[in-house]
């Protein structure tokens, strides 16, 4: 038999590592027991945000030399739930937007739980929470789409924190970093050598193409080329100084 361990987390899945192997002898009924110790990875000791899947493969050979194999998978972790959420790194706050707080058990099956979320101001360099009081709070039901309206929150760096309780009463948390901004911002909301946002890159006779470009640098010169497919629409030099410019390109038949 062999026992292999894979480590799962929000950001990666590790390759399986063999942690045990050996031989056992079946009893008179043809049954045998495999000793399996669910060892943690030394790299993630006591890390609540990772869990493991242990693959136990047994290969049995009878006296006639016939061989059969079977594999079982055991999931284990310090928590019985995994909580995730997707929040765009750059989130436009001008309009309400939808979000889903996803909760799954360690086998990847959805689990319905109630939870809480809180949005905190953060340091724009490392996204560490910069204040104890959240700027927005609320509740959610896992795996259900809900709408957030943050238009009155100042542009800047934030951390969204969410938490639920698993079936053992243990807290399970998830964090997501985001920069909130408005299309009306006159300067980048965080220090940015290049700030780019394209609310509409496809256009027709009624809807122009629109994008915003800016920089936090002072007295910066930028060469800008705008293409529609392979066709160059415009080429110009920009002199920007801690500002954002909005560009609008109405559709023309000559663009093709």
Describe the residue ranges of each PLM region.
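A structural signal for beta-strand and strand-to-loop patches characteristic of beta-rich domains
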Residues: 1-256
């Amino acid at each position: 038999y062999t026992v292999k361990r894979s480590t799962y987390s929000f950001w990666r899945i590790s390759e399986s590592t063999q942690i045990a192997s050996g031989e056992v002898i079946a009893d008179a009924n043809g049954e045998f027991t495999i000793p399996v110790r669910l060892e943690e990875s030394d790299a993630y000791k006591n890390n609540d945000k990772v869990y493991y899947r242990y693959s136990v493969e047994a290969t049995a050979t009878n006296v006639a030399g016939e061989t059969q194999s079977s594999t079982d998978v055991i999931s284990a972790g310090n928590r019985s739930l995994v909580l995730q959420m997707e929040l765009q790194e750059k989130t436009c706050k001008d309009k309400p937007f939808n979000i889903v707080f996803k909760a799954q058990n360690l086998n990847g099956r959805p689990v319905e739980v109630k939870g809480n979320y809180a949005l905190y101001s953060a340091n724009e360099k490392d996204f560490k929470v910069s204040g104890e009081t959240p700027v927005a709070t609320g509740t959610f039901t896992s795996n259900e789409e809900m709408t957030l309206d943050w238009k009155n929150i100042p542009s800047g760096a934030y951390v969204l924190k969410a938490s639920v309780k698993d079936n053992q009463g243990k807290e399970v948390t998830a964090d997501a970093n985001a920069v909130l901004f408005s299309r009306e911002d006159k300067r980048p909301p965080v220090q940015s050598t290049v700030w780019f946002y394209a609310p509409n890159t496809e256009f027709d006779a009624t809807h122009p193409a629109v994008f915003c470009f800016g920089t936090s640098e002072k007295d910066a010169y930028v060469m800008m080329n705008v293409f529609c497919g392979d066709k160059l629409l415009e080429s110009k030099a920009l002199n920007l100084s801690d500002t954002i410019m909005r560009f609008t390109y109405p559709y023309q038949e000559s663009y093709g």
